[in-house]
A protein has these predicted regions:
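Contiguous beta-strand/loop segments that form the cofactor/metal-binding neighborhood of enzyme cores
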Residues: 104, 108-189
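A contiguous active-site-proximal alpha/beta segment in oxidoreductase catalytic domains
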Residues: 9, 26, 32-93
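Alpha-helical elements of Rossmann-like donor-binding domains used by nucleotide-donor carbohydrate transfer enzymes
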Residues: 1, 13, 40, 67-70, ...
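Short glycine-/small-residue-rich Rossmann-like dinucleotide-binding loops
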Residues: 6-7, 159
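Rossmann-fold NAD(P) dinucleotide-binding segment
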Residues: 9-28
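Short glycine-enriched, charge-decorated loop/helix-capping segments at active-site entrances
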Residues: 97-101
Length: 194
C-alpha cells in the first residue's frame, strides 16, 4: 500500500502511479485540485474493477459522528431539517489561499454532512463575511458556505482558519423532533421529547 501526504498539486500523479501498479492507496485530501483529475482517477479505478483508493476523510470513523449517524438513521427524532457546522483552526500557514479554506478545511464538513444525511448537494454557495485581521493578506477568512441537499436539508458551514485560540469542530443536526449535537469535548448530546 502507498500513503500519499505530499503537497496538494502532486496527489493526482502519485495516485495514478499507484493505480498503474494496482496498489492500495490512501491519499490525503484533496484527491486532486480539479474535478477532471478526480474523474480521471475514478475512471482508472473502475477500469481496474476494484476500489483501491481511499481519501483521508476520518470523521466517518469518529465515535461521536457515528453515534450522530445512528440517531439520524433511526428516525427517532424525525427527519433532518438543517445542519450547523463550524471548523476553526488556530492559524494558517504561509501561502494558504482562499480556495484552501474549501479544499483543505471545509471539505471535511462537505463530506461528513453528505454521509450523515445520505443525500447529495443540489445548491452550494460561499459567502464572504466580515474579515478577520488574523488572516494572510488576500485570504478570505472566515468563510461561510450555505448548501441545500436534494431532499431539502439546509446546511451552513463556518470555516475560520486563523481563530487565534485552537482547533474547534462543531456539528449540530436539527431534526423535526429534536437535535443531535457534537459539542466540545467530542461527546454527543441529544435533545428531544422523552
Amino acid at each position: 500500500a502507498v500513503v500519499i501526504t505530499s503537497i496538494d498539486p502532486t496527489h493526482h500523479d502519485y495516485v495514478m502511479k499507484t493505480l498503474a501498479e494496482e496498489k492500495w492507496c490512501f491519499c490525503e485530501k484533496p484527491l486532486s485540485q480539479n474535478a477532471a483529475d478526480c474523474e480521471d482517477i475514478i475512471k482508472r479505478e473502475q477500469e481496474i474493477g476494484k476500489r483501491l483508493v481511499q481519501v483521508g476523510f476520518m470523521r466517518h470513523y469518529d465515535r461521536g459522528y457515528a453515534e450522530m449517524k445512528r440517531i439520524i438513521d433511526s428516525g427517532e427524532i424525525g427527519k433532518p431539517l438543517l445542519i450547523k457546522c463550524c471548523h476553526r483552526n488556530v492559524a494558517q500557514g504561509p501561502g494558504f489561499k482562499t480556495e484552501n479554506g474549501v479544499t483543505n478545511v471545509a471539505i471535511h464538513e462537505l463530506d461528513i454532512c453528505r454521509w450523515l444525511l445520505g443525500d447529495e448537494y443540489e445548491d452550494v454557495q460561499c459567502v464572504k463575511v466580515r474579515q478577520s485581521s488574523n488572516s494572510n493578506k488576500g485570504y478570505d477568512n472566515p468563510q461561510v458556505m450555505l448548501m441545500r441537499t436534494k431532499n431539502g436539508c439546509f446546511i451552513d458551514v463556518e470555516v475560520q482558519v486563523a481563530d487565534g485560540y485552537g482547533y474547534d469542530i462543531q456539528c449540530e443536526v436539527v431534526c423535526e423532533n429534536g437535535t443531535v449535537k457534537l459539542p466540545d469535548p467530542y461527546a454527543v448530546v441529544r435533545r428531544s421529547r422523552p
